[in-house]
Amino acid sequence: MTKRKMADPDDGLFKPGSKLKHIKTGGFYQVLLLANIEATLEPAYVYESMQSNDFWIRPKTEMEDGRFELISF
């Protein structure tokens, strides 16, 4: 069995501390870290809403597909 590579923050388009704008909603978010989804080991971002302070997790592929715009890092 081949061991899958765990998420490496250097592999992500957005680095921890980056501030993002969601294109569709206009919401602002801060990236906290790059993690792995337990069931699949798929890389995922953990990020926080800068308005509500809610925490979110989104697969790396979705996060980097153009729905978020980098505003600062």
What are these regions (language model features)?
Residues 18-23:
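A short beta-strand micro-motif
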Residues 15-16, 43, 47, 66-68:
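Tryptophan-rich substrate-binding surfaces of secreted polymer-degrading and adhesive proteins
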Residues 39-58:
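Short solvent-exposed strand/turn elements
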Residues 54-73:
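Intrinsically disordered, low-complexity, charged/polar segments
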Residues 27-36:
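Short beta-strand-centered aromatic/proline hotspots
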Residues 33, 49, 72:
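Pocket-edge structural micro-motifs
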Residues 37-38, 64:
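Short, surface-exposed beta-strand-loop junctions and turns on beta-sheet-rich folds
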Residues 1-16:
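Mixed-charge, Lys/Arg-rich low-complexity intrinsically disordered regions
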